[in-house]
Amino acid sequence: MQFDNIDSALMALKNGETIIVVDDENRENEGDLVAVTEWMNDNTINFMAKEARGLICAPVSKDIAQRLDLVQMVDDNSDIFGTQFTVSIDHVDTTTGISAYERTLTAKKLIDPSSEAKDFNRPGHLFPLVAQDKGVLARNGHTEAAVDLAKLTGAKPAGVICEIMNDDGTMAKGQDLQKFKEKHQLKMITIDDLIEYRKKLEPEIEFKAKVKMPTDFGTFDMYGFKATYTDEEIVVLTKGAIRQHENVRLHSACLTGDIFHSQRCDCGAQLESSMKYINEHGGMIIYLPQEGRGIGLLNKLRAYELIEQGYDTVTANLALGFDEDLRDYHIAAQILKYFNIEHINLLSNNPSKFEGLKQYGIDIAERIEVIVPETVHNHDYMETKKIKMGHLI
């Protein structure tokens, strides 16, 4: 498929056009027509109904939903993607509410600042969806994409979306979407590209605190940061003057290894080794909330259950439905840039960290090996990291 850049899509939306937005191939892997409510024209919903034929929905911000008392359609949402459908609506000035004209009227009234909850009949023929406050950075769905795109065009935070179906009633994917794009001369973007666009456009971290932190390995400066869009908390330990070509360790949080000294992994040993090195030579440790290579603590324990049944650390992740490594290093790169660091010496045995930082503009001048002893309990784990994940150990 041939995708367009985000800026060209924003211009098209602001001109009242409809675009195609494609989500992740591991999610729905489908394309929706998306329009911005404030800019869309009288033919937009008719085009969606005639050409796309999916369910026409109206993503809105939480503020709009709360102001108009758009309550959730069900109390117990069991949708696998957590789509926040509200009760369906028609504006009171409509008749049946189903015509393209009347659904357009209802959508436009959603963003009218003079509209009140009493101005909408329930149920109706337009289906509002409530977007997460932090948009695609919190949830990579079409709902959030539509509201984010509206905001990026300077419009009120609301859109209209419709899934694209083939003539035979199946969902359009891949080359079907490409043909639809070419037939109707539409811009087509991915939610992944929208996520990256927002990451580059907006700061993702906030500095919160700095303290002296005495430890068993020396006294460090500890900085506290908050991830703007996920509310995750990140701490950074530094020793000595901060400079270019800083010695840097990116350490993914490991409760079992770092705190309980588990011998299933080498995480705790690597952290202690890095703290000793940084205390002696100066540098920085960025402690990232990426438990279990990004799958979280409880899923890591589930992976351990599978390992006890004969899986390894990679096949266990895959069996649980995850990639072998979900970590992203954009936050780490943002923290380095906060300290005006673009060139580092990286304490790591993991090549993916090198590539992960390079894609966000961080130059790795030198790799510093982190040497820790194996134990009888983590031998197979270490071998898997070396053979299947390419770790330099």
From Swiss-Prot:
Pfam families registered for this protein in UniProt: DHBP_synthase, GTP_cyclohydro2
Gene Ontology terms for molecular function: 3,4-dihydroxy-2-butanone-4-phosphate synthase activity; GTP binding; GTP cyclohydrolase II activity; magnesium ion binding; manganese ion binding; zinc ion binding
Keywords: GTP-binding, Hydrolase, Lyase, Magnesium, Manganese, Metal-binding, Multifunctional enzyme, Nucleotide-binding, Riboflavin biosynthesis, Zinc
GTP cyclohydrolase II: annotated segments: 201-393
Active site (UniProt): D325 (proton acceptor), R327 (nucleophile)
One GO term (biological process): riboflavin biosynthetic process
Pathway: Cofactor biosynthesis; riboflavin biosynthesis; 2-hydroxy-3-oxobutyl phosphate from D-ribulose 5-phosphate: step 1/1; Cofactor biosynthesis; riboflavin biosynthesis; 5-amino-6-(D-ribitylamino)uracil from GTP: step 1/4
Cofactors required: Mg(2+); Mn(2+); Zn(2+)
Gene Ontology CC, one term: cytosol
Record: residues binding Mg(2+) 2: E28, H142
Coiled coil is among the record's keywords: no
Catalytic activity: D-ribulose 5-phosphate = (2S)-2-hydroxy-3-oxobutyl phosphate + formate + H(+); GTP + 4 H2O = 2,5-diamino-6-hydroxy-4-(5-phosphoribosylamino)-pyrimidine + formate + 2 phosphate + 3 H(+)
UniProt binding sites for Mg(2+) 1: E28
InterPro entries xref list: DHBP_synth_RibB-like_a/b_dom, DHBP_synthase_RibB, GTP_cyclohydro_II, RibA, RibA-like_sf, Riboflavin_synth_RibBA
Binding-site residues, GTP: R249, L250, H251, S252, A253, Q270, E291, G292, R293, T313, S348, K353
EC assignment: 4.1.99.12, 3.5.4.25
Binding site for D-ribulose 5-phosphate: R27, E28, D32, R139, N140, G141, H142, T143, E163
Free-text cofactor note: Binds 2 divalent metal cations per subunit. Magnesium or manganese. Binds 1 zinc ion per subunit.
Residues the record lists as binding Zn(2+): C254, C265, C267
Site-annotated residues for Essential for DHBP synthase activity: H125, E163
NCBIfam families, per database record: PRK00393.1, ribA, ribB
Family per record: In the N-terminal section; belongs to the DHBP synthase family. In the C-terminal section; belongs to the GTP cyclohydrolase II family.
Full protein name: Riboflavin biosynthesis protein RibBA
Organism: Staphylococcus aureus (strain MSSA476)
